[in-house]
Amino acid sequence: MAANVPTLETRRLVLRPISLADAPQAQALFPKWDIVQFLDAHVPWPYPPDGALVFYRDVAIPAMERGEAWHWSIRLREAPDQLIGSITLRLGAGKNRGFWIGKAWQGNGFAAEACDALMAFWFEELGQHLLRVEKAATNEASRKISEREGMRLVATEERTFVGGK
């Protein structure tokens, strides 16, 4: 775990910095069409059997160590050993935030609650002035979270996602 990634807590959630030990749980939950269809096309599909481990080991954890990104596992306070999703913040001019929630936990407001915690961290702790989130136009659930947070649409462009354009 990178020292610059704190554990964050909300009313119902614990956001814990990811570690290689999280890879098996992430691997079990992540490679589902309902989750990956709205993600950038660079996410391999079908998802490889070691996809979570490779991503954590080769991409996420090194970015955390360099101070370029913050990756958390999302867990319920009442069951902190069970990973239910993941959420990320990244520095730079592009996409600053991304998240996914396992199918069994979708529709309960967990993504919105995790996003609220990250908004506070991004603006208050990191001192950032702008948060950009990119999403597939058909990703209604993610769009609703952004609207609830007071975000506004500033641009549209054609992009390729796992599920197409």
Regions found by a protein language model. Name each.
Residues 36-58, 70-72:
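Conserved GNAT-fold acetyl-CoA-binding loop/helix
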Residues 1-38, 71-165:
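Acyl-donor (CoA/ACP) binding surface of acyl/acetyltransferases
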Residues 63-67:
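Soluble sensory domains of the PAS superfamily and closely related sensory modules
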Residues 2-4, 58-62:
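Short, P/G- and charge-enriched loop/turn segments at secondary-structure junctions
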